[in-house]
Amino acid sequence: MNNMKKLWALLLALAMTFSLAACGGSSDEEAATVDQTTEEEVPGDTAPESDLAYVQDKGTLVIGITEFEPMDYQDADGNWIGFDADMAAAFAESLGVTPEFQIIDWDNKVMELDGKTIDVVWNGMTLTDEVTSAMDCSNAYCNNAQIVILPADVADQYPDAASMADLTFAVESGSAGQEQAEANGFTYTEVVDQATAVLEVASGTADAAIIDSLMAAAMVGEGTSYDQLTYTIELNSEEYGVGFRQGSDLVDLLNQFFVDSYADGTLMEIAETYGVQAAIIPQE
C-alpha cells in the first residue's frame, strides 16, 4: 500500500513538473511573439503632413497679411485686393480651395503659421535670413528696397543716413524696416504695420519712417492721401517671397504656379493693375 502511495506521489510530481514546464515555455513563446510584433509595428520616420491635403480637406487657404497697399489692401466694399491678394486668390483657385485673408501681427507671423492659424504668409515679405530659417519660402518674385519717409518740407535737410542720426523713426515691428533702423543705429518706435508708421510721420509723432519702396510709391507724395510726405533714400535692396510651414509641399506648387502664370501673362497683367510691373522678377 505504501508503495502504491509512493508511486502515485511520484506520478503526481512528474505531472506537475511537465505542466509548469509547458506553462513556462508558453510564456516565453508569447513574450517572444509580443516582442516580435512590437518590433514589426514600430513605424519608421513618418512623412510630414501634407499641407496640400490639409488645405484641400478644409476647403480654404488662410493667407496671413497686413494692410499693405499695393500688395494687400481693402477696396470700398471691404474685399481684399492688391498684387499679392490677387495672386494668392488665383493660387487658391488652382488648388480648388477658397482664399481666406487673415490680418496678423507681423511680429508673430511664424507663430501664426506653425500654429495653423494661417497657412501661408503672403504680404510683400522680405526674404531675410530670419525668415528663410523659420519658414520654407517660394522663389523670389518681386524686387524691393527699404526707404525713408519724411515730411516733404524738410526732406532736403536729410540727404543720407548719417544726417538722420538724431531723428526718431517709426517702423513695423518685426519688419525689414526695423532691421534697417537697427543696422543704421537709428532711434525707433515699433508700430503694428507700415501704414501706421506712415501715419506716425504725418501726425508728427515720429520724425521719419522706414517702409517698403513699393508701398511708399503707392501711399506717399502727390496725388495720395499723404501728399505732405515724400520718400527719399534707399537703405538696402531686397526681394519678396511667400512663406509656408517648414516641409510644406505647397512651396513647389507655388513656384510652378509662378512660372505658369508668368508664361501665360497672368502675373504681369495683375502686376500692371497695381503698378508694380517694373519690380517683378521673371519667373522661368
Task: State what each model feature region is.
Residues 19-34:
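Bacterial lipoprotein signal-peptidase II cleavage site
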Residues 35, 39-40, 85-94, 173-175, ...:
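Extended ligand-binding regions for polar small-molecule ligands
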Residues 35, 43-124:
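Extracytoplasmic small-molecule ligand-binding "clamshell" domains
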Residues 83, 101-112, 156, 173-176, ...:
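Short helix-initiation/N-cap motifs at beta->coil->alpha
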Residues 93-94, 102-103, 107-120, 134-136, ...:
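Short helices/loops that flank or line small-molecule/ion binding pockets
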Residues 143-150, 213, 217-259, 277-284:
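Periplasmic-binding protein-like
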